[in-house]
């Protein structure tokens, strides 16, 4: 399987990389979050722009991005607008979703962009092309906050993301019981052994799925999310604790 390098971070080699989301609603809150990140051990930051109060003004988003980028130094930055139907804070039109992500990919200030698999397919294809034209990696994602699909469905979505040009396919699902967590882990292992030609990301959410955020090196997931100020999804573990646990598990593998 190939690796994916973003700045100095290599996905698909060694322990899962740690991504810390920034979820500030105002620019001041975002600036405060970047100050907290300065003392954390993590690999990349994610700006969850759907939390931002001015998210429907592209110029305001760009202005905030320039401030964030300047404060993050050489840490890679993932830009994410999470739609409400996939667990985010708000819904926008397909046209605006495409325009926002395209405009930010063209700034040269982000390293990765999240593209939801189930957005309008013409929008998905255009965003993948635009991102790659500007040297931006694509995290293509699917989130199910209601259930855990069957193993075959999880594999189908991840393989479809590869076909569409995702650099890092990603799926997050909600478990109802321990068996659901095992379904996600089994799918992850099967993806790694039989279908993946690039790093990918999987997780089972909530406290019940917490083990999947820790076991990526064993089963095949290349990235995990840890919280700093506020979690962006159920089950996220504090980033400092996450690093300690991942390091311990890495020494045993």
Curated annotation (Swiss-Prot):
What Pfam families does the annotation carry? DHquinase_I (PF01487)
Active-site residue numbers: 143 (proton donor/acceptor), 170 (schiff-base intermediate with substrate)
Record: residues binding 3-dehydroquinate: 46-48, 82, 213, 232, 236
User: Which keywords does the record carry?
Assistant: Amino-acid biosynthesis, Aromatic amino acid biosynthesis, Lyase, Schiff base
On the tree of life, the source organism's domain of life is Bacteria
Q: Which SUPFAM superfamilies does the protein's record reference?
A: Aldolase
GO term, biological process aspect, one: amino acid biosynthetic process
**Which EC number(s) does the record attach to this protein?**
4.2.1.10
Gene3D superfamilies recorded: Aldolase class I (3.20.20.70)
Gene Ontology molecular functions: 3-dehydroquinate dehydratase activity
User: What pathway is this protein a component of?
Assistant: Metabolic intermediate biosynthesis; chorismate biosynthesis; chorismate from D-erythrose 4-phosphate and phosphoenolpyruvate: step 3/7
Q: What residue stretch is flagged as signal peptide? A: none
Q: How does it assemble?
A: Homodimer.
Name the family the entry cites. Answer: Belongs to the type-I 3-dehydroquinase family.
List, alphabetically, the HAMAP family matched.
AroD
- Name of the protein described by the UniProt record: 3-dehydroquinate dehydratase
Give the source species: Syntrophotalea carbinolica (strain DSM 2380 / NBRC 103641 / GraBd1)
